């Protein structure tokens, strides 16, 4: 029989060869058991997380798809991957999200447990301790670099807005190949190892 000689078969062989070179490990998400089932964060794969209200979906997604991968990339010298996160938040503002990220960093680096409302000394909470405030302010460079290199926050999130901003990002950061019916046939990113 004649061998299959198609672009699809070529892609199959290329993926097998990359895997044999250890280049299909993906980007670690910080949850080993989960990664055993879904093989880490992989380029070109869409993961959907669903569940009831208040069950920790946002906390899981933030940890697995933002905090842990960014931490891995910034600390690991041998990774081929980079990551860019287009973060659409309907529930909380970018300021609130950054405050939560700062609280997490305080806990990771100093074992200081503080929530974002306490960080802002809101309501009947005590004023934030000056030593903790100094530690918060010392994280500025870390977070500014993280945001400039890895995260773009969007506070509006209608379906049309999401489509428009993703389309703009894709067009600026890659080449879209269309067929004669103008359907997208292939996307060739300028940075093939960047997971978006």
Located regions from the model:
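The Walker A/P-loop phosphate-binding site
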Residues: 2-110
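Cytosolic-facing regulatory segments adjacent to core modules
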Residues: 36, 72-191
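Short acidic catalytic loops
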Residues: 192-196
């Amino acid at each position: 029989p004649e061998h299959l000689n198609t672009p699809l078969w070529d892609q199959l062989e290329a993926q097998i060869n990359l895997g044999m070179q250890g280049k299909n490990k993906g980007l670690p998400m910080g949850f080993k058991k989960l990664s055993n089932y879904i093989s880490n964060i992989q380029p070109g794969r869409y993961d959907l997380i669903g569940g009831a209200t208040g069950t920790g979906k946002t906390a899981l997604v933030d940890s697995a798809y933002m905090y842990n991968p960014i931490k891995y990339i910034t600390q690991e010298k041998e990774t081929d991957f980079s990551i860019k996160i287009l973060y659409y938040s309907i529930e909380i503002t970018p300021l609130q999200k950054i405050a939560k990220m700062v609280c997490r960093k305080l806990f990771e680096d100093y074992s200081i447990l503080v929530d974002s409302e306490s960080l802002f000394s809101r309501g009947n909470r005590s004023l934030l301790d000056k030593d903790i405030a100094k530690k918060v302010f010392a994280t500025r460079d870390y977070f500014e670099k993280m945001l400039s290199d890895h995260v773009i926050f969007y506070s509006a999130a209608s379906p049309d807005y999401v489509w428009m901003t993703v389309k703009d990002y894709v067009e600026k950061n890659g080449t879209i190949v269309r067929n004669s019916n103008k359907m997208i046939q292939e996307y060739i990113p300028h940075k093939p190892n960047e997971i978006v």
